[in-house]
């Protein structure tokens, strides 16, 4: 497995599509802070600080930026074997298809955690640059932990999309577009029960994120249902 992971990592290092994830997650805190500057004064948060920025980034990453990035990168890793006609060479080693797909998924999972850490760093730099207040060790640890854990749970939710669209030649771009719509659809689940079951919102609930302010949920979420919602995607 280690040799497979190492070979997949070498492929990823030669892949410019990784820049999609880096740019997307760098844009997230900028977009979230920028939205505070362009909205009308009555809708603006007068107490916008580091805590609010971290929450915004957790929401933005899970709703838009991570689903697009992870499905695109993971789908490309699987798709390239058929596109570049290298699958027949791999099969002669021999390496079973499930083992190869498992190595690719494991790499994307590790990448999700690294992208989460990267997002924490970019969020910190953004907040310091624009002069936000309220940065304490507790705020940084809580916000940073939520960002990284949400990146991992979002990856778990995106696994079926990566597998399905990665094995359909040239379809990983379509899969990333579908991931965007599925992530954005969190806004439409106002019931706490429905939000807990819907995989993308369940990914946030599992890390202790308050959905009421962002999705307008009318009842409290249920962590046990969130485990089921994410578990269904993992066991797909």
Predicted regions and their residues:
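Aromatic- and glycine-rich beta-strand/loop motifs that create alpha-glucan
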Residues: 1-25, 170
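Hydrophobic alpha-helical elements at and bordering transmembrane segments
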Residues: 5-12, 100-101, 144, 148
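Pore- or pathway-lining transmembrane helices of multi-pass membrane proteins that form conduits
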Residues: 20-26, 169-187
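Secretory targeting signals
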Residues: 26-69, 102-167, 172, 219-225
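Terminal transmembrane helical anchor/hairpin motif
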Residues: 34-54, 176-236
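Transmembrane alpha-helical segments in integral membrane proteins
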Residues: 68-82, 87, 158-173, 230-236
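Helix-loop-helix units of permease transmembrane domains in multi-pass membrane transporters
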Residues: 77-109
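Hydrophobic alpha-helical interface/terminus motif in multipass membrane transporters
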Residues: 78, 87, 122, 126, ...
């Amino acid at each position: 497995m280690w040799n497979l992971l190492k070979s997949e990592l070498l492929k990823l290092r030669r892949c410019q599509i990784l820049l999609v994830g880096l740019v997307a997650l760098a844009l997230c805190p900028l977009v979230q802070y920028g939205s505070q500057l362009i909205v009308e004064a009555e809708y603006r948060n007068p107490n916008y600080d580091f805590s609010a920025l971290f929450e915004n980034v957790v929401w933005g990453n899970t709703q838009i930026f991570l689903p697009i990035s992870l499905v695109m990168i993971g789908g490309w890793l699987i798709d390239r074997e058929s596109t570049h006609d290298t699958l027949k060479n791999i099969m002669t080693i021999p390496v079973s298809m499930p083992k190869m797909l498992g190595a690719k998924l494991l790499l994307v999972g590790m990448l999700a955690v690294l992208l989460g850490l990267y997002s924490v760093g970019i969020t910190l730099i953004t907040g310091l640059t624009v002069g936000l207040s309220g940065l304490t060790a507790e705020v940084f640890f809580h916000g940073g932990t939520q960002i990284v854990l949400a990146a991992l749970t979002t990856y778990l939710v995106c696994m079926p999309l990566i597998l399905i669209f990665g094995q359909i030649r040239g379809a990983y771009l379509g899969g990333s577009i579908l991931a965007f719509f599925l992530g954005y659809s969190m806004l439409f689940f106002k019931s706490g029960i429905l939000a807990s079951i819907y995989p993308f919102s369940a990914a946030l609930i599992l890390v202790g994120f308050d959905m009421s302010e962002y999705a307008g949920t009318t009842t409290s979420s249920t962590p046990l249902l969130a485990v089921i919602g994410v578990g269904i995607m993992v066991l797909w």
